[in-house]
From Swiss-Prot:
Belongs to the EF-Ts family. InterPro entries: EF-Ts_dimer_sf, Transl_elong_EFTs/EF1B, Transl_elong_EFTs/EF1B_dimer, Transl_elong_Ts_CS, UBA-like_sf. One of its GO terms (molecular function) is translation elongation factor activity. The keyword Cytoplasm applies. One of its GO terms (cellular component) is cytoplasm. This is Elongation factor Ts. The gene is tsf. It is found in: Cytoplasm. SUPFAM superfamilies: Elongation factor Ts (EF-Ts), dimerisation domain, UBA-like.
């Protein structure tokens, strides 16, 4: 199939990828727009992984207050002040602050979850599985699955994004890294709730 400039522009508008990347993705997928979007997203993951080790000493702090009852402050880091002042970068930080207000994660990543929290949940799941009368081999698999699900619910980057449940927060972060062309990281956040 012949790849037209209109197709390249449409894909570029959807993904914010470079023109040559869009043309290459359309060529590789024989003009299939959806497959090209998926291919560019996969490449975005590779770009994010390549940039992950780079220092993020610039960034922004954004806040979100919901109904004067819940407040969130978040620090999102990047490599340059050019990106730190970018409207899309700041919107990303604000959107993640709203997400935190709604979903209440306890840590940015798995590494930030206190071991005692995971051990306490694991003990509960083991007891529940044993009480159900399942064999021990199955109990272990059930517990591993439940612990993984629990981590996905309390770990910010593994949570489904509230404004688009098809993506995780990490997916959004990877897309932004690919668009901005530099490493971006969610450094930390604080969530406050009246009466909590």
């Amino acid at each position: 199939m012949a790849i037209t400039s209109k197709m390249v522009k449409e894909l570029r508008d959807k993904t914010a990828a470079g023109m040559m990347d869009c043309k290459k993705a359309l060529t590789e997928t024989d003009g299939d727009m959806e497959k090209a979007v998926d291919l560019l997203r996969q490449k975005g993951l590779a770009v994010a992984a390549k940039r992950a080790g780079r220092a993020t000493s610039e960034g922004t702090i954004q806040t979100y207050i919901h109904g004067a009852k819940i407040g969130v402050m978040i620090e999102v880091g990047c490599e340059t002040d050019f990106v730190a002042k970018n409207e899309e970068f700041c919107k990303f930080a604000k959107d993640i602050a709203m997400h935190i207000a709604a979903v209440n994660p306890i840590a940015v990543s798995r590494e930030g979850i206190p071991a005692e929290v995971i051990e306490r949940e694991k003990a509960i799941y083991v007891q529940q599985a044993l009480d159900s009368g399942k064999p021990e081999a199955i109990v272990e698999k059930m517990v591993v699955g439940k612990v993984e699900k629990f981590i996905g619910e309390i770990c910010l980057v593994e949570q489904k994004f509230v404004m688009n449940p098809d993506l995780t927060v990490q997916d959004l972060l990877n897309e932004l890294v690919a668009k901005m062309g530099e490493n971006i990281s969610i450094k930390r956040f604080a969530r406050f709730q009246v009466g909590a």
